[in-house]
A protein has these predicted regions:
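Extracellular beta-strand elements of beta-rich domains used
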Residues: 46, 217-221
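Flexible glycan-contacting loops in extracellular carbohydrate-active proteins
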Residues: 188-218
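Short, aromatic/His-centered strand-loop micro-motif at the edge of beta-sheets
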Residues: 145-166
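Extracellular carbohydrate-recognition regions
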Residues: 25-59, 227-253
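Secretory/extracellular carbohydrate-interaction modules
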Residues: 76-143
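Extracellular glycan-recognition surfaces and repeat-rich motifs
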Residues: 50-80, 249-250
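Short tryptophan-centered beta-strand motifs in secreted/extracellular beta-sheet-rich domains
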Residues: 46, 106-108, 163-180
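Beta-strand-rich interaction surfaces with strong enrichment in secreted/lumenal proteins
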Residues: 31-32, 92-98, 153-159, 205-206
Length: 253
């Protein structure tokens, strides 16, 4: 299934005209490189305001999430919640999508608004502490295995607060591909990718800047077929793969 099917779905529902500016993107530039989409698990455009379905959107660390203005918007936890905690205070809005299959293809739009960048946030991840894309004003990088290994990076793809990002991620076995509109395409192969974390929020996840907000839109998640694309065995060899580097966290192990 092509990402353009999202646009076709929105047209058929008559909601294109009321969608936020994050839809001003050519989804045709984001098509699966590795996997073949199968059954749709989640298609969400957040057209109705209100509370979120907790079985689909799992708020983390007491942070607050609701559908507003055509997006899923996340805020930090309340001052009362933070005062009651000794750790995991919820200073940054965090959410996970537990309906994400173990192997998947997922397309989504997101942005981080306000707040402060730190060494940890903001990020998007796939599996809790399994595969994480960290956004920084110095560039963006991909870290895996409990953030111990940096396996991809781009100095040119810098974090811009308030900017909408559009991504397509694919995971099958120990292989992962993620691509961004007007950004990098990364391929990673690591054994940790095939192992779900036994704790925390699994599936697609996001964490915003400290004391800031996260906005999410245009979420489409599919199960995938058992076979990969015919072109994949050759295509995987075309990626420029960096030699993994231990992070500060990895060096302490």
């Amino acid at each position: 299934m092509k990402m353009s099917s999202i646009r076709m779905l929105l047209v058929s529902l008559g909601v294109i005209s009321v969608m936020p500016a994050c839809l001003a993107v050519d989804w045709d530039t984001l098509q699966p490189r590795m996997v073949i989409p199968d059954k749709s698990v989640l298609q969400e455009t957040f057209s109705k305001s209100g509370p979120v379905k907790k079985t689909t959107w799992q708020n983390r660390q007491g942070t607050r999430w609701s559908v507003e203005d055509g997006v899923l918007r996340g805020r930090p936890s309340s001052e009362e919640y933070q005062a009651s905690r000794t750790h995991h205070y919820g200073y940054e809005p965090r959410v996970s999508v537990p309906v994400t299959p173990p192997e998947f293809v997922a397309g989504f739009s997101f942005r981080f608004v306000g707040g402060e960048e730190s060494d940890i946030v903001p990020f998007i991840e796939f599996g809790h502490h399994v595969c994480r894309v960290k956004f920084s004003n110095k560039g963006t990088f991909l870290i895996v295995d409990h953030e111990t290994l940096k396996v991809a990076e781009s100095d040119e793809f810098k974090y811009v607060p308030g900017k909408w990002y559009h991504a397509l991620a694919e995971l099958k076995g120990d292989e992962f591909v993620i691509q961004f509109v007007d950004g990098p395409v990364w391929y990673v192969k690591h054994e940790c990718l095939a192992k779900a974390n036994s704790s925390g929020g699994n599936g697609l996840g996001l964490a915003g800047p400290k004391d800031g907000m996260v906005e999410l839109d245009n979420v489409s998640i599919w199960k995938i077929r058992s076979q990969v694309k015919r072109s994949w065995p050759k295509r995987r060899n075309l990626f420029d793969v960096m030699n993994p580097e231990l992070t500060g966290k990895g060096k302490k192990k």
